[in-house]
Every structure is written in structure tokens, then in C-alpha cells.
Amino acid sequence: MNTDVISGKKTGSKSWIRVPLLILAAAVAIFAVAEMYQRIQLWRHTRVPVLSNEQPGPFRRDNTLGWAPRESYKSAYTRSTLGGTSYPVRYSVDASGLRGCSTNGNGRKILVVGDSHTHGLEVSNDKPYPCVVARDLKASAVAYAAGGYGTLQERMALERFIPQVQPDLIIVQIGYDDFINNDFDLEKASYINNHNMLRPYWISGQIRYLWPSHFPSGFEYARAHSRLFSNWYDSLLQKKSMREQTVEVDIAKAGAAYPGFDAATTATREVFGQIKALSAGRGLVVAATELSEPYHSAFRKIFQDLNILVIEDAAVALADARARGMDVYARDNIHWSEAGHQIFGDALARGILAHPELGFK
């Protein structure tokens, strides 16, 4: 006899799932409304299409480089120095994503690749250090760079733009974070230099595209397809970066003996060997932005082995200016103000002029 009767009516064997299904349907509806709200708000402020998963701003996803400057992008905004001085910024790149300088020079061309220090979002057109160098050397210059670029991405950019620009001099900007960004395991263990995007790595003699995520791949898929999840995810990463010890702290303590540092050094050396080959017949200069250890010694050994000219004077000049109390950093205390770019560019130009074989005088 069936005893599953309430008020004389049979409930049925599947009635128990109705409440969970209703709860799930309500949760999906709430999520959909919140997601659409986020997308509409983004459209209102940036004009990114409501149904697009593209991130707004000066960079876009790129199948080869991982991410790249958004072509023909223009923007005007306000930035502040670390000392609190506000100033207007007018930013633009051309149809190739190159940030150029208004100097015409004497016909000699400079191509600069690097990371966010080279891209110079904190300063207006003609203010980034590549333009300072171009003016000092009476040359023309263009730069292709993006925040978080590692040495392999810079090599790929050179492959793309050397035929187009036909530069007389190539400048590759370096920083300690290149070692982190050149190695998958080190970047995955980092919270301050992890850009949480699919990117190319040079591993065992070949290019591999990997995502240095702290979370399972499903999180990354959801982040790429949901504005709501992306905002939550980024907030979670920011909180973790404030709590967790990052790999850079461990490397500072252990030095070059830190597990994995050798692999990063090997990859960096091999890719710079490729850059030297790409630059054959042209001037090649490496511009150091800072000289912290153990990265500085590793870089110096690489460039000695490959016979590549590295100029450290600009990093020294910038550090000296800061020690004297000059307001050379932007509010984030990472990137440079207009004064910082000017000091770095002037010192780099003097370093280039000290080597007449580069053809500038």
C-alpha cells in the first residue's frame, strides 16, 4: 500500500527535487540579472558591446603574444605622482599598436620593446623614455610594449616589427620581473608579477602556451566569459596577494639557489640569444631598469656570455634621483612619473652616445 499521501493526494516519487530545482532556478536568475547589470554598466562607461567578452582598456587578447596594445586606441585621463602632484595624460598608439614620438630626427630609427615601463601609461605621448632618447639622439623612435611582457613576448614583437620599422638601433628594456615572467612555475608561484593570462613560455627549446593560474582551469574559463565572475575573481586574487607570501620574497632570501631560478635563467639566456640573432646588422642595447639581486648578476652573466651591450647607468640615475628626494615615481610606486621617464631617458641616451659603434653622435 502506498503511504506517501498528503491530504489525500499522492506527491509522487520525484517531488523531493522540486525545492532544490526552484532554488537553483532562482540562483541562476539572480546571477543572470547581476551579470547583465555588470555588462550594461561596462557598456555605459566604455562602450564595450554588452554581449562581448573582450576586456576594455588599452590592451586586448592576442593569439600569439597572449595580450597586446589595442590598435589605434586613444584615451585622456589624470595621473598623480607619488608625491601627490596630479597631471593630465593623453595616450595613443597607432594602427599597429606602436607608441610613437613626434621627433623626426636625422633619419635614424629606434625600435624599443619592453614591459609597462616602456609602454608608459602614466605619461602623455612624447613623454615616455623612448621619446626622450630619440630627442637626445636626434632620431625617431617607436615602442611596442605591454605590462607583464617577458623576454619571449619581446622577441616575438621584434619578429613582427623589425621588417616594418627597419630600425638602426633596437633597445630591449629589462627588469627583475622578466625572470618571473619567463618561467611558468615562478610566475604561477607569484602574486605580484602574475598576470593571470594565457601567455607563451620558452620551455625545453620550444614555445608553449600556458596559463599560470592559482586556480583550476574552470575558474579561468568562467572568468573569461562572465563579467560578474571576473570581478569576483580579481578581487579574490587581490586579497590573496596581500595574505600569501609571494615567490619574489623567497628568491630574495635564497638568491640564485632558489629552486627554479636556474631554469628561468636558462630560458632568458636562450631567448636573448635569439634576439641577438634577430638584430644582426643593427645596433642592440639592453636597458636595465633596476639592479636588484640575484637578477642583476644573472643578467650580467647572460650579456657577458652573449656579448650584448647592457646599459645600467639609467637605472643608477633613477635610483640616485629618488634618493635625493625627486618625485620620479607615479602614485603606484612602481611606474615612473614624467620626471622619472626624463631622467631615465637622458641617462640611457648618454650611455648610447658613449658607444660610437652604435652610430649616434
Predicted regions, residues:
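N-terminal Sec-pathway targeting helices
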Residues: K9-A27
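Membrane-interface motif at the C-terminal end of an N-terminal transmembrane signal
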Residues: I30-T46
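Interaction-surface signature
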Residues: W43-R61, L152-A256
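Membrane/wall-proximal cationic-aromatic binding patches
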Residues: L42-R135, A139, A317-R322, D327-V328, ...
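Short beta->alpha junction loops
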Residues: A143-T151
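Conserved, well-ordered alpha-helix/loop/beta-strand core segments that scaffold catalytic motifs
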Residues: L169-N181, D234-A319
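Short, intrinsically disordered terminal tails adjacent to the first/last structured region
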Residues: M1-K10, F360-K361
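Histidine-centered active-site loop/cap adjacent to the catalytic His
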Residues: P20, V33, A330-K361
